[in-house]
From Swiss-Prot:
The keyword DNA-binding does not apply. It comes from the Eukaryota. FMRFamides and FMRFamide-like peptides are neuropeptides. The modification Leucine amide is found at residue 15. GO terms for biological process: neuropeptide signaling pathway. This is Extended FMRFamide-12. It is found in: Secreted. Belongs to the FARP (FMRF amide related peptide) family.
Length: 15
């Protein structure tokens, strides 16, 4: 999934 503006479940590149 592309990097979202907010980590609403998609935190794969969110450090």
């Amino acid at each position: 999934s592309p990097v979202p503006e907010d980590d609403r479940g998609d935190n794969f590149v969110r450090l």
